Regions:
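Glycine-rich phosphate-binding loop and adjoining beta1-alpha1-beta2 segment
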Residues: 78-105
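N-terminal Rossmann NAD(P)H-binding glycine-rich loop of SDR-like oxidoreductase domains
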Residues: 46-69
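Glycine-/Pro-rich loop/turn segments that contact NAD(P) or position catalytic residues
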Residues: 138-256, 288, 292-295
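Conserved Rossmann-fold cofactor-binding substructure of NAD(P)-dependent oxidoreductases
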Residues: 113-129, 139
């Protein structure tokens, strides 16, 4: 060990004057490991830090960062400096061991950062070492704000995979101005909630020669099995969304004091169970992405003068009967989540109360390999643009277009691709991201970037299934 330590000191002396790296020693048992860290003395930061790396989703995100870093190297790009962060050094080392096994890549250069969501000082230190924090610690309603605060106060960008409306809109209300001033992008909903919805619409706009009025979206998964259980972290986040639903209104009224203009050709809200005759799909109303899309459309109307697109979201079902059964299941989950005592029981016995749909251990890896998702969006609009976004058309929409977004298992594989792609887009295309900073949605932040192409390189697809045509 003395020989190793002496060698390490010599290496540190050699590279400590570098503007890029310093070195530190991390001891694991009797083995002293030389681990590359971002230089605190020289003020350098890691490009990416995965916070919550020891969690179920965090493990998948670490593996996706490793593959992305390898891809960047193979393309001759600037090497990625990155680290993983959590409370336990041993567990962080275990994460790297698993990631090395799953990816077949050497991860000796990945840094370790100790940080605890209950210790603001440690979060500040982590953020000060980061260019972009990839925050995997949820539920965000419980644990998200201290991380956002640390990033804003210490000049780090931030991405998360929150689908929790109260958290996202509260963060925009509290930290948007400070984030703008600090020049950092705080981007929520960078996973299955809500990148396919928000950026699917963006892809549709790029390919629609005219102006869109409305979009309907149907989500579908396939290839699952009884072993494809959902991790309880997702369940807890969903339950907290339901529990806190009454608080959203007050936040939104303060955040958006004036309503959007009423559309001349308003699309009627569909019922819980609805069939789209054009697509031939049955759908169950499931508006999880609607608040995110609303914020994007509001921004584009207020800041860019665009016409807000009306948006409705559904889970695609194979039949009317399947749809009715899903509605019953959703009503059951809604009731369990609405009261504190039933919610506590749900959190304590998720496997029993959800018939194995949610498990604390999450899904078995093998069961995720055949799992895929498809998002189908059908847009309706006008074939010609008016001079101003505030002008009104004399006749109803006359054209339609269909876009599909596809990817691997939505909960972990695709979510990791989307989250890491969002972080890499901020890292590599910061100047193309919206504004100089702020708390925003993916559809705002990444509208003018190459994030869609980046995600397609990593295994997803955004395609125009049906070119624009007259109704």
């Amino acid at each position: 060990e003395c020989v190793v330590i002496t060698a390490a000191v010599k290496v540190w002396r050699t590279y400590s004057s570098s503007s890029y790296f310093s070195w530190s020693l991390v001891t694991r048992g009797h083995q002293t490991l030389l681990t590359r860290m971002a230089s605190g003395l020289a003020g350098q930061r890691y490009d990416l830090v995965v916070f919550g790396a020891t969690g179920y989703t965090g493990q998948f995100v670490v593996e996706e960062v490793a593959r992305t870093a390898q891809q960047e190297r193979s393309q001759g790009k600037v090497p990625l400096s990155w680290a993983i962060a959590g409370r336990s050094e041993k567990k962080l080392q275990d994460v790297l061991t698993t990631a090395k096994k799953e990816t077949g890549l050497s991860l000796e250069d990945v840094g370790l950062v100790l940080a605890d969501v209950s210790d603001q000082k440690s979060l500040n230190e982590m953020a000060a070492k980061s260019n972009v924090v990839i925050n995997c610690v949820g539920p965000y309603q419980l644990y998200g704000e201290p991380v956002v605060q640390a990033c804003v106060e210490n000049g780090a960008n931030h991405v998360d995979i929150s689908g929790e409306t109260l958290f996202m809109e509260s963060m925009q209300l509290k930290y948007n101005k400070a984030a703008e001033k600090a020049g950092v992008h705080i981007v929520n909903a960078c996973g299955y909630d809500s990148i396919p919805a928000d950026l699917g619409i963006r892809h549709m706009i790029r390919n629609f020669k005219g102006e869109l009025n409305s979009v309907e979206m149907f989500v579908q998964t396939s290839g699952g099995s009884s072993k494809s259980a959902i991790h309880t972290g997702t369940m807890e986040s969903a339950a907290l969304v339901i529990a806190n639903r009454s608080k959203v209104g007050a936040i939104r009224r303060e955040l958006f004091p004036t309503p959007l203009p009423k559309p001349k050709y308003k699309v009627a809200k569909k019922g819980f169970l609805y069939k789209n005759d054009t697509l031939g799909y049955w759908g169950v109303s499931f508006p999880s992405d609607e608040p995110v899309v609303y914020r994007t459309q509001r921004y584009r109307h207020e800041m860019l003068g665009e016409r807000p697109i009306q948006f409705q979201q559904f889970i695609r079902m194979p039949s009317l009967l399947h749809g009715a059964m899903l509605i019953i299941g959703m009503a059951y989950f809604f009731l369990l989540s609405s009261f504190a005592w039933t919610r506590n029981l749900l959190f304590k016995y998720p496997d029993i109360l959800t018939a194995g749909l949610f498990k604390k251990a999450g899904a078995e890896r093998e069961s995720l390999k055949n799992l895929k998702f498809t998002v189908t969006q059908i847009g309706h609009g006008w074939s010609e643009k008016l001079a101003e976004g505030s002008d009104e058309y004399a006749s109803p929409p006359d054209s339609s277009i269909i876009v599909k977004v596809k990817g691997p298992d939505p909960g972990y594989g695709a979510t990791s691709i989307m989250m890491v792609s969002a972080a890499m887009t901020i890292l590599r295309e910061k100047s193309l991201c919206a504004e100089k900073g702020g708390v925003m949605t993916p559809g705002i932040a990444f509208a003018n970037t190459g994030i869609i192409e980046r995600m397609c390189e990593r295994g997803m697809s955004f395609t125009v299934e049906q070119e624009q045509q007259k109704n």
